[in-house]
Amino acid sequence: MARKTILFLSDSDQFSGGYLKRFHYFCHARQSRGFEPLLYFTPGADRKPGNPWAAHHIRGIDRVTEPDAYFLAGLDWQTVERLGLEIGRRPVLNLIQDFWCTDRNDPRWHFLPRPATRICVSAGLAEAVRDTGQVNGPVETIEPGVALPDVLWPRSVAPVDVFIGASKNPAVGRAVAFGLSRRDLAVELCDGEIDRGEYLARLGRAKVAVQLPLAQEGFYMPPIEAALVGAAVVVPDCIGNRGFCRHEQTCLVPAYEVGAIVDCVRRLCEDDGLRMRLLRAAEAEARTYTLARECDAFLRILDGAIFAQVTR
């Protein structure tokens, strides 16, 4: 029997973590026993050689017709409407990666009453989505898998004491860097967007990684990446990192204040025993955040209830 079709959209004009995760789910759907994923690039979408679709030689379809099911994320609901497709007649998988849809003033809020099976990237986000009282359909949680390049910068090359990932909060990052430099620590500050490979290479040179999220994140990947490249982590709470980031167990979780962050970094730099204990625990747990685990969880949903709806 021919597989049913599920439509994915690519409408981003630049690379982001959310964009990469959409690509991962497309690849997962290729392993489905019941569905064939189709990809459509909207006008203006990034098709440059560096994006994951191009790197894996995945070409989009030229013309959109109504599929058997939809995989939607972010504002894809609006895009589908602009394409003139009757989305209400087909089952929808809706990937939710942030808290925007829980804000009554955000356009994503108005999509919650639409029927869909929603996949949230953390338990905290799933709880917030349910608490809106607006959601129509099941709400599932699949924590993201992490994919790191096979080759990273050797740790023996020009190591530093502290790496600060501050692209989401440059002001606090610069203040933390200043506070640490006064304590004779070698600091590398990353307060802007850089190539992912370069970011991981710079991260992998550090003994301690400070990661500065937004106040709320659906899921926060940088602490897991840091653990996998061998850096102990200091990171404030952002709700979506609570599954992995547990104070004194896998990392240190200070208040989101410059002084508190500096104190935690100094503590790890001065206490090798603590730093290595946290790093070992974090690295062991980080290794469970695999794309294979994410894929298995997704296919249980896609080839389960959703598949049953389409083939009735």
What are these regions (language model features)?
Residues 232-235:
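Short hydrophobic beta-strand element within catalytic cores of glycosyltransferases
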Residues 200, 223-228, 242-243:
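Short alpha-helical segment that forms part of, or immediately flanks, the ligand-binding pocket
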Residues 44-115, 124:
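Extended catalytic core of nucleotide-activated donor transferases of GT-like folds
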Residues 274-288, 297:
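A short, well-ordered alpha-helix in the C-terminal region of glycosyltransferases
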Residues 211-222, 238, 242-243:
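Nucleotide-sugar-dependent
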Residues 18-25, 128-131, 138-199:
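Conserved catalytic-core segment of nucleotide-activated headgroup transferases in glycan assembly
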Residues 291-312:
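C-terminal alpha-helical cap of glycosyltransferases
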